[in-house]
Amino acid sequence: EQLAAVQHYFIHSHTVTQLYTAGKYELEALELINRLFDEGHETLVMAGGSGFYIDALVNGLDDFPSADLQLRNDLMARLKEEGVEGLRQELRHLDPESYATIDIANGQRVVRALEVCLMTGKPFSSFKTSQAKRRDFEIEKIGLTRPREELYDRINRRVIHMVEEGLVEEVRGLTQYRDLAALQTVGYKEIFDWFDYEAGLVSAEGWTPNTPGDGPVTSLDRAVELIQRNTRHYAKRQLSYWGRDKSIRWLTL
């Protein structure tokens, strides 16, 4: 309905198999913005989203170091064998700012941030430019918020709506791509974990509620609970991150 009412960009624009970075987004978004202004548009709205990508467009990024494939493969092996929690805590120790701003439920993003930290000895977040790049347009930041209880209720209901609209079928159709970065995100990972349990690849034997971690995803209901919880946690981190930006004008819905 929203897509039909207003022209949107960067939706259905890339495939899950494409490697996409904040640096690429900065370049492509600036090119699009300049074109739209040249066509006569006076005001453009950027809606989101990932703090890292918004910073890339608003302030620009320094050049990030090239990937260390051996280190990345080692970290990806740890992610697969140990899960994301240990990597998260390592990132939290090495780079608290990145821990607070990236989607830490996305194992691929945690791996990339850790890769840069370990390879350079500097925080991943330090590569965000300390001096904002000049843009040829004015930027006004508007933040939308609502009471926490209402926000969480809307998140919970939205997840249920996503399932009713075919989330499980969508994820099932993407199973062969599950290791790609684009699918290491909240909403996909939990469903994949449920599929693994259903296929007998994961056992609940020996697991109790006191066992560290989330345990096996033994039902769709459990997957939905985890998606709701992880989305709430992500929203909380986003609010904390944006709350430190004094240039934002906040509106309560």
Task: Give, region by region, the residue ranges found by the protein language model.
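Phosphate/pyrophosphate-binding catalytic cores of soluble transferases and nucleic-acid-acting enzymes
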Residues: E1-L253
